Amino acid sequence: MNVPRLPSLLGVFAHPDDESLLAGGVLAQHHAAGARTAVVTATWGPDSRRTPELTDSLHALGAGAARLLGYNDARNPEAAPGQPQLVDAPLDEAVGRLVAHIRAFRPDIVVGHDAVGQLTGHPDHVRTHQITLLAVEAAGLAHLYPEAGPPWQPSALYAATHPESGVGLLGPLLEGVGKSVLAVRDSYVTTSVDVTPWADMKWAAILAHRGEVARERSLPGILARLPEADRDRIIRTEHFTRLTPEPAKGDPVQQGRVSKIDRGL
């Protein structure tokens, strides 16, 4: 069986567990195809209780060591004591930190959060989306953040997202524990990836976040308590919107969802 060559991939997510929940399948897929993969996490510090779990999750996905921006979580002050919350941190500073990671790793593709903050609209998700948009553009401009290393321009930026038609079983479960459910129109999705062959790796990465799995109101906790068949239906497809470069007129991605079952991002 020939494994298609896939581009290098850098995930940028707000919290430990976002990487496995939102893009664990494509990270595992790209790694299995021999591509370089890595993840930058915006909140929680190196000495926090969740960083060892993040390390285990990244190991399960083949995504290397944890790379941290080091900011505090908007809803959990123990994430990075003494550090500003991500939502309060100077935007220029946060962008500069991410630019340094992009230039150091030199990814072909960056994938991060969408503009609505995924299903729950977490403010850290929204802020990470804003930081990622700016950092991907700035990383390719030599006159910006010269201290962050030689410029590097990723070829594309994708946002992990949830289309209205894909919320299905998950929506009522989140509403049942008092969480918001925010989805985008199906037409906003440009790529849907069937990650079934890598679902076991993705699930192992989710389970690595042991503290979240133990919390019944968290998404990992909700998934862990579902029948296996229902859980598999939720985690085996990942949806993305290509943000840059914008689809050209007449590009197939403008016509709605493009399935890349074997090609990843």
Predicted regions mapped to residue ranges:
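Metal-dependent de-N-acetylase/amidase catalytic core
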Residues: 1-8, 81-82, 89-265
